[in-house]
Amino acid sequence: MICRSPLIVVMLFVIAAHTVLALEIATRIDASETESPVSAQMTRVSYRPITSVDNKRFLRQETTFEKKLGVNDVHAVHAEERSALGKAKILGRDLLWFMSILGRFLIPRIGRRGP
């Protein structure tokens, strides 16, 4: 039992790490569906004169506007989402594998008492 305790701790740590990574990837995918990519935002700077005694002063205005996504931008966003989904699937598969090992081999042996 003492020999298997470190193995169980390592297995539980790996399961927890995979779960956290899978949730992080899923959160990133959800965020990319609701927010526009940063590259699609541009800043336009314009100057307009202030009506005053001296017309030499100008006011700088920054306006952020959305740029229409081109075909390549859309493909890049979809490729990023596909790679994130692929990573999430791999993490999920590994998590199921670890849980099956834990359920099949380690948990039944923990309950048994040796002679």
From Swiss-Prot:
Induction: Expression is up-regulated at later stages of infection. Its main location: secreted. Transmembrane segments: none annotated. A motif (RxLR-dEER) lies at residues 57-82. It is found in: Secreted; Host cytoplasm; Host nucleus. GO terms for cellular component: extracellular region; host cell cytoplasm; host cell nucleus. Keywords: Host cytoplasm, Host nucleus, Secreted, Signal, Virulence. Residues 1-22 form the signal peptide. Disulfide bonds: none annotated. The RxLR-dEER motif acts to carry the protein into the host cell cytoplasm through binding to cell surface phosphatidylinositol-3-phosphate. Belongs to the RxLR effector family. Effector that acts as a broad suppressor of cell death to interrupt plant immunity. Inhibits cell death induced by cell death-inducing proteins, including the PAMP elicitor INF1 from P.infestans. This is Secreted RxLR effector protein 2. It comes from Plasmopara viticola (Downy mildew of grapevine).
